[in-house]
Design a protein with these regions (language model features):
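A short, charge-rich alpha-helical start-of-domain segment used by transcription regulators
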Residues: 1-19, 32, 110
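Amphipathic, Lys/Arg- and hydrophobic-enriched alpha-helical face
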Residues: 9-28, 44-45, 102
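Structural recognition of an alpha-helix C-terminal capping motif at a helix-to-coil junction
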Residues: 19, 33-40, 44, 52-64
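Residues within helix-turn-helix
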Residues: 29, 124, 135
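Arg/Lys-rich amphipathic alpha helix in sigma70-family domain 2
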Residues: 60-80
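Short amphipathic alpha-helical boundary/capping segments
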Residues: 97-105
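A short pre-motif secondary-structure segment
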Residues: 112-116
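DNA-recognition helix of helix-turn-helix
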Residues: 130-154
């Protein structure tokens, strides 16, 4: 990967990486640090990373650095960045309900749900990012969605 390809990766993936890191860390500064660290690792390994695989590589590094951040600080918080489709003015509490539902999941399940359902990644891409195989991703997502469904259909959790 040359400097032009690297710069293209920065322009193309910086925002998506920041959103993902922010959802994982819950803090803007931590998210910026994680994204910067991911791009530093890409720069250091630019000779080994192919342009086509840069996206998966960056998300994998971001995911791992978010986990490292969790270990250092002892807590990981998944937050949903402002999204007009989820935070419509008629449903201001929907974001809070969804955040509480996501908080019911373990760290790995939250990451999988965020990558698949919020960011729209394919199972194959999620497997590359997390180091799981596709079957594991599908099983863990299915289980996570069952937990979310059970939480969301409970009236006490919504009121």
């Amino acid at each position: 990967m040359d400097i032009y390809s690297y710069n293209a990766c920065v322009q193309q993936w910086a925002d998506a990486l920041f959103r993902f890191a922010y959802k994982c860390t819950g803090h803007e500064e931590d998210a910026r640090d994680v994204v910067q660290g991911a791009f530093e690792v890409l720069w250091q390994k630019r000779g080994d990373v192919q342009q086509e695989k840069a996206k998966a590589f960056l998300f994998q590094v971001t995911y791992r650095q978010s986990v490292d951040n969790y270990r250092k600080k002892g807590k990981i918080v998944y937050k949903e960045a402002e999204r007009t489709d989820l935070t419509h003015p008629q449903n201001p509490d929907l974001k809070k309900i969804l955040d509480k539902a996501l908080a019911q999941l373990d760290e790995q399940s939250r990451a999988l749900v965020l990558l698949k359902d919020y960011e729209g990644y394919r199972y194959e891409e999620i497997a590359q990012i997390t180091g799981l195989n596709e079957s594991q991703v599908k099983v863990y997502l299915h289980r996570a969605r069952k937990v979310l469904k059970a939480y969301l259909v409970n009236v006490e959790n919504i009121i």
